[in-house]
Amino acid sequence: MSKQGHKASVQVSPGEGAFGPIYRSFLSPEHLVERPHEGIHTMYELMEEARKRFGDKKNIAWRDIVDEHQEQKVVTKKIGDEEVKETKTWTYYELSPYKYITINEFFKTVDEFASGMHQLGLNQKTVFNIFASTNVSWQVAAQSCFRQGITFCTSYDTLGPEGLQVSLEEPEVQGIFTNAQHLKVLEKIIDQTPLLRVVIYDGEADENILNRIHSKISGRPNAVLIHYDEVIRNGKQNMVGPAPTQGKDVACIMYTSGSTGKPKGVILTNDNLIA
């Protein structure tokens, strides 16, 4: 039930054959809702509306990893008719208390990171990839792409080298954001993705891996291996405005997990995302 006492959804079409009836929100039974507010046509405009209305609210929160604990466990699995025991390592994370920032503080970082991406030559003519754990920096990268009209791909951080390669090759990605712990996966396939020239990472990375990746991309035009914090610093010193975008523009290509074959890219426009 809605707050007004209405049913949250109403039936607008009966079922047919193997298909059940169609339901829609009681607020819009005649047609699908196309946008959350008049005048909003893109994800950037949606986020700007949130900034105007809720900018001083501490709505962004995260917890840092304080420590990592590992425990050995014996598990039993069945192979054919036989039960086989094997020892597996389980990892548990000790987390800090929640840390909060306001919407305004979050989007200040987005403005700076987006400007830093612009300085790296990433724009509406290039495709970006986010291969990272879902956290605040993931959101900063995504919102920065929305701001600059950069189509970005999302790749599960659990993808192996082959799956990641598909999500870089197929859309002809030129830049990627990832976490330090995932650089070893990127390193394995970076030779097979010659168009990739900008690698942005956060966290503390292994210097040996950084050196090897730098060596692999150094011959590519305008190649850069750069830390997330440095992108923000560069952007802060060279601020640029948002790029114009439209509802019909492709905003995101979401890659599947690849559990039933190679990952598949689902193309989403701004219109799709705000509807």
Regions of interest found by a model, annotated:
Residues M1-F26, T245:
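Cytosolic, low-complexity regulatory segments enriched in Ser/Pro/Gly with interspersed Lys/Arg
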Residues S2-V12, L46, R147-R233:
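Structural core segment of the AMP-binding/adenylate-forming
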Residues K3, Q11, H37-T87, K108, ...:
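A short N-terminal helical cap/helix-turn-helix that marks the beginning
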Residues L27-P29, V84-P97, I232-G241:
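Short glycine/proline-rich turn/loop motifs
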Residues K58, G219-I226, I232-Y255, K262:
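Conserved pre-ATP/AMP-binding loop-to-beta segment of ANL
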Residues D64, H69, K73, E82-E105, ...:
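Conserved AMP-binding/adenylate-forming
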Residues Y100-I103, A251-A275:
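Conserved AMP-binding A3 loop
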Residues F128, C145, I176, V250, ...:
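Conserved S/T- and glycine-rich ATP-binding loop of Class I adenylate-forming
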